[in-house]
């Protein structure tokens, strides 16, 4: 939102059972070009169905499916330089496990700047409440106009909904780090929740400064935000919680239901007194 006066806006509620925790705002990053878009980028692909342009249309309902070839190649070409710092892939709503390689074209041809796995093979919410969560991978600042994403081992009729190449930094593997998407079997090995250090950010001004984050929770009434915003461009973030949908198991039918909130002592005590 643009500050310098009163801001009045309806904030979307993710679901009926959503419970607000905090509404915060922070200054938007001052970057000239945030990401490749459908308006400035041409997308072509081999080893897929037709219609690769849907990968950057901003609509997760449109999907590009792979045809079962051992390798699929997706080229994204733009007319102006992009300072790439992150790639985020939104899988199609179909189980997928594959290996990916991101390349940029230079004077000597394409070179690889990131290799990463994509594992959304188990959509059961027992292993993450966001079954087809995006895969976020950071790269050291890389400037280019022609990028290539090579996908190997993806099965026929799996695919991607969106591919975002961005100049803005993003936490790598944030879905996994917040347990929105966990290890894909119930028995992870010890190393499954360890991650590499992502590349050091080259421009500190692109990161959110904690000192500049403003708590505007009291400005929210229902779904309507009314805020006297300071001058500048601001990002408003509504945060909250909702049940994951996981039910306790094993249990007798009369004892089956949503798991108790183990982070709130009063609720946990009530559960203990009622059932133990």
List each language-model region with its residue ranges:
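Disordered, acidic Ser/Thr/Pro-rich linker "stalks" and the adjacent N-terminal cap
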Residues: 3-81, 92-96, 115-129, 169-210, ...
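Extended, low-complexity, turn-rich repeat/linker tracts enriched in Gly/Pro/Ser/Thr and Asp/Glu
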Residues: 91-98, 155-157
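Beta-sandwich interaction modules
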Residues: 116-158
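Edge beta-strands of jelly-roll/beta-sandwich modules across compartments, strongly enriched
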Residues: 154-168
């Amino acid at each position: 939102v643009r500050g310098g006066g009163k801001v009045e806006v309806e904030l979307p509620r993710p679901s009926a059972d959503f419970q607000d925790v905090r509404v915060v705002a922070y200054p938007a990053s001052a970057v000239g070009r945030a990401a490749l878009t459908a308006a400035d980028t041409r997308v072509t692909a081999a080893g897929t169905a037709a219609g690769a342009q849907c990968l950057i249309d901003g609509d997760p309902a449109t999907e590009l499916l792979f045809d079962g070839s051992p390798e699929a190649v997706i080229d994204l070409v733009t007319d102006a330089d992009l300072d790439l710092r992150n790639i985020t892939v939104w899988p199609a709503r179909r189980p997928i496990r594959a290996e990916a390689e991101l390349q940029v074209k230079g004077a000597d041809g394409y070179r690889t700047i990131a290799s990463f796995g994509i594992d959304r093979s188990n959509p059961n919410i027992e292993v993450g409440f966001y079954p087809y969560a995006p895969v976020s991978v950071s790269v050291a600042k890389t400037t280019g106009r022609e990028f290539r994403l090579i996908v190997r081992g993806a099965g026929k009729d799996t695919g991607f909904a969106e591919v975002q190449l961005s100049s803005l930094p993003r936490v790598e593997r944030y879905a996994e780090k917040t347990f929105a998407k966990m290890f894909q079997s119930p028995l992870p090995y010890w190393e499954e929740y360890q991650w590499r250090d992502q590349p050091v950010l080259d421009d500190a001004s692109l990161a959110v400064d904690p000192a500049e984050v403003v708590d505007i929770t009291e400005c929210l009434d229902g779904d309507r935000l009314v805020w006297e915003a300071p001058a500048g461009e601001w990002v408003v973030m509504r945060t909250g919680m909702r049940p994951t949908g996981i039910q306790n198991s094993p249990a007798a039918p009369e004892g089956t239901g949503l798991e108790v909130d183990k982070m709130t002592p009063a609720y946990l005590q009530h559960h203990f007194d009622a059932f133990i």
